[in-house]
Amino acid sequence: MKSITQLENKKVLVLGLAKSGEAAARLLAKLGAIVTVNDGKAFEENPSAQSLLEEGIKVVCGGHPLELLDENFELMVKNPGIRYDNPMVARALEKEIPVWTEVELAYLVSEAPIIGITGSNGKTTTTTMIADVLNHGGKSGVLSGNIGFPASEVAQSVTNQDTLVMELSSFQLMGIESFHPHIAVITNLMPTHIDYHGSFEEYVAAKWNIQNEMTSDDFIILNFNQDLAKELATQTNAQVVPFSTVEKVDGAYLENGGLYFKGELLMHADELGVPGSHNVENALATIAVAKLSGVSNQAIKETLSSFGGVKHRLQFVDTIDDVKFYNDSKSTNILATQKALSGFDNSKVILIAGGLDRGNEFDELIPDITGLKKMVILGESAPRVKRAADKAGVTYLDAKDVADATRIAFEQASAGDVVLLSPANASWDMYKNFEVRGDEFITTVERLKG
């Protein structure tokens, strides 16, 4: 860990705990800051706060009192899930208190160069692919960030012989100042999280923060399937390395079924260990990073051929009576489900879809669901999803939850079919998060197998 002095004796408020807040509080204390932690959960029900108090860190729990900001804090480090219109954050900004997320702290102390991956879809899969390729190629890629390992915790233990492979959300990227990856990847940009950001333009601006401090010695990898990425490519100091599945570019691209980097064939798309056009895009981004990092072609091909996916991201679960089950619970928007379906023969797919109703219609999904064997529909958004199914001419059945939907889908399936959980909706109408939803699917499949 780098030895830094800029936070010594600074009064810092950590707003919100969870994994990242707890890690940030401990790191700040280690760096000599005077730390106060504020979390909305009551102290009696808050083991993280109890643990921090035992370590000598001040904690304020059970609410977010605005008067706490009268204590002359010089910095706020907030949980990325807390919005900027939260009264505590808004008041801090009024007082001109800098507001960071923990990835800024991670950058400040990391001895390792950083590869930062962001985007609307494919972040986790691409991040995991990159780390796997680096490790197989002898480069020591260490996962961190939005993938479940707090960056500020992981960054303390890496050395300059490692590479910190960091998944970054738009929420995290709103709270950076000096953060400077050597390689940045933007998988794609679609209109998601507008309820948080207010507009697509603000969302894109948050993502684009990833390259603010990059120079001509750095690389940014952009998806040239999108015109927006081509526009953004003119607005960075970093060297742009494009990838595309629709045209030959000066980077990584798909041509006649082959995956190329700057004219050199590395492997064929049908050799990838995970299905779907979206995973071809993820693989191309990974190839670009790997080639820039000096990984051999053999290591790239071996890794991508054996890569089995990420839990809840088009994850193969099991086969029962020659029926395959795939868990794609992470598909919380229409684009993600479209990409999941692209990897299968619709006539053999029973799709489980539906979830939180955000007022979206699903007409965009009609071409992608046309020809499905059946759909099983659940959740608040069920009436809207059913309208799309009717327009597509797809037969559907109702289910009360994911377990029920999985059982119904299996009853409708024949040998050679695929049962695909790819909801195209967030999970919060029924489940705490998409992981819990996906775990219910996996557990139900296990029970069906007996």
From Swiss-Prot:
Localization per Swiss-Prot or TrEMBL: Cytoplasm
Class of enzymatic activity (EC top level): ligase
Transmembrane segments annotated in the record for this chain: none
Pathway annotation: Cell wall biogenesis; peptidoglycan biosynthesis
Main location: cytoplasm
Enzyme Commission designation: 6.3.2.9
One GO term of the biological process aspect: cell division
Residues reported to bind ATP: G119, S120, N121, G122, K123, T124, T125
Annotated catalysed reactions: UDP-N-acetyl-alpha-D-muramoyl-L-alanine + D-glutamate + ATP = UDP-N-acetyl-alpha-D-muramoyl-L-alanyl-D-glutamate + ADP + phosphate + H(+)
Keywords: ATP-binding, Cell cycle, Cell division, Cell shape, Cell wall biogenesis/degradation, Cytoplasm, Ligase, Nucleotide-binding, Peptidoglycan synthesis
Domain of life where this protein originates: Bacteria
GO MF annotation terms: ATP binding; UDP-N-acetylmuramoylalanine-D-glutamate ligase activity
GO cellular component labels: cytoplasm
Signal peptide: none
Acyltransferase recorded as keyword: no
Similarity section: Belongs to the MurCDEF family.
Role description: Cell wall formation. Catalyzes the addition of glutamate to the nucleotide precursor UDP-N-acetylmuramoyl-L-alanine (UMA).
Protein name: UDP-N-acetylmuramoylalanine--D-glutamate ligase
Organism, scientific name: Streptococcus thermophilus (strain ATCC BAA-250 / LMG 18311)
The encoding gene: murD
